[in-house]
Curated annotation (Swiss-Prot):
Highest taxon of the lineage: Bacteria
Something else known: Reaction proceeds by a ping-pong mechanism involving intermediate methylation of a conserved cysteine residue.
Protein's cellular compartments: Cytoplasm
Record flagged with keyword Transit peptide: no
Main location: cytoplasm
Described purpose of this protein according to its UniProt entry: Specifically methylates position 2 of adenine 2503 in 23S rRNA and position 2 of adenine 37 in tRNAs. m2A2503 modification seems to play a crucial role in the proofreading step occurring at the peptidyl transferase center and thus would serve to optimize ribosomal fidelity.
Protein name: Dual-specificity RNA methyltransferase RlmN
Cofactor note: Binds 1 [4Fe-4S] cluster. The cluster is coordinated with 3 cysteines and an exchangeable S-adenosyl-L-methionine.
Assigned protein family: Belongs to the radical SAM superfamily. RlmN family.
Length: 373
């Protein structure tokens, strides 16, 4: 039986150089190879013309460059493109390309499904299947870059920003997320600025501390409620890591981070008559008073079977004004791609192999009662 080949998309530069040392080659050869893979999108060793033939043959014998395939895509009227990415065994994740006038952001998944069971998120309703590998994470960027034409003129803006805000909780897959983000930041990888790579978390505090020791990227935190009582319902991981513990972890992270410029991005989904009253806005402002931040208010994007509705524009406006009275920077996020279910909270994935999934959790089965504001 032949030995399984090493997928080079699984290796950050440190691991790539270790491989080349094992091959008896100098470190700069690893850097050359990474440029071919990530700057030019080349997966055939024979096309790497500044690498000698003997080394190309060695690489072909032991290694491969394999990214997950795009199995389908939909394009929104606003230019957003949602990709279904096949990651094997009948499994798919979703990756979303969001073009704007001055940038193009790719929203990347870190897991197949999600275990956190946030009650307003469609991905959470599926349960959790597995973590994505490094190659499956960076492969989303690599494959979509191919779709966009890499350096060629295709009419689409090249990817300038990456947000780990797709399917899954990135901090529950640190072993793969950290080297994947290393590749995103590496000059010989995707060469993105650390301020253009954002990780979003719902608050796995010990893993947030580990991230801070390993990497410096922009941080977005999913708060979604101004107190523990409501957040226990909306974001159940709060029962393990309550708000004050989460906020302390956030402050530790931004204290050692340059990417965040001294403040964190707070994400707050606006749920009609659930978390959007003016009283709750005052409560949120008081909650965040010791944590430098800007606040993204996210209009809820309904999905089939969702027990929640989207806050009205007038309620969002009142909520926003209260926060600004406290001196907070507030942005009301423009909904993108909701006509193709690509908006925030709508990534569900067409996953056919569900044998390892948790049973679906439905709000109506839990008999959760939330006080109407």
């Amino acid at each position: 039986m032949s030995e399984k080949k090493i997928n080079l998309l699984d290796l950050d530069r440190k691991a790539m150089r270790a491989l080349f040392a094992d091959l008896g080659e100098k470190p700069f050869r690893a850097d050359q190879l990474m440029k071919w893979i990530y700057h030019f999108g080349v997966s055939d060793f024979e096309e790497m013309t500044n690498i000698n033939k003997v080394l190309r043959q060695k690489l072909a014998a032991r290694c491969e460059i394999v990214a997950p395939e795009i199995s389908g895509y939909q394009k929104s009227a606003d230019g957003t493109i949602k990709f279904a990415i096949h990651v094997g065994e009948g499994q798919e994740v979703e990756t979303v390309y969001i073009p704007e006038d001055d940038r193009a952001t790719l929203c990347v998944s870190s897991q197949v499904g999600c275990a956190l069971e946030c009650t307003f998120c469609s991905t959470a309703q599926q349960g959790f299947n597995r973590n994505l590998t490094v190659s499956e994470i960076v492969g989303q960027i690599w494959r979509v870059s191919h779709f966009l034409g890499f350096a060629k003129e295709t009419g689409e803006r090249p990817i300038t920003n990456v947000v780990m805000m797709g399917m899954g909780e990135p901090l529950l897959n640190l072993a793969n997320v950290i080297p994947a983000m290393d590749i995103m930041l590496d000059d010989f990888g995707f060469s993105l600025s650390k301020r253009r790579v954002t990780l979003s978390t719902s608050g796995v505090v010990p893993a947030l501390d580990k991230l801070g020791d390993a990497l410096d990227v922009a941080l977005a935190v999913s708060i979604h409620a101004p107190n523990d009582e409501l957040r226990d319902i909306l974001v159940p991981v709060n029962k393990k890591y309550p708000l004050q513990e989460f906020l302390a972890g956030i402050r530790r992270y931004i204290a050692k981070s340059n990417a965040n410029r001294g403040r964190v991005t707070v994400e707050y989904v606006m749920l009609d008559h659930i978390n959007d009253s003016t009283e709750q806005a005052h409560e949120l402002a008081q909650l965040m008073k010791d944590t430098p931040c800007k606040v993204n208010l996210i209009p809820f994007n309904p999905y089939p079977g969702s027990p929640y509705g989207r806050s009205s524009n007038s309620r969002i406006d009142r909520f926003s004004k209260v926060l600004m009275e406290y001196g907070l920077t507030v942005i009301v996020r423009k909904t993108r791609g909701d006509d193709i279910d690509a908006a925030c909270g709508q990534l569900a994935g067409d996953i056919r192999d569900r044998t390892k999934r948790l049973a679906k959790k439905r709000m109506q089965e839990n008999q959760i009662s939330v006080t109407m504001n």
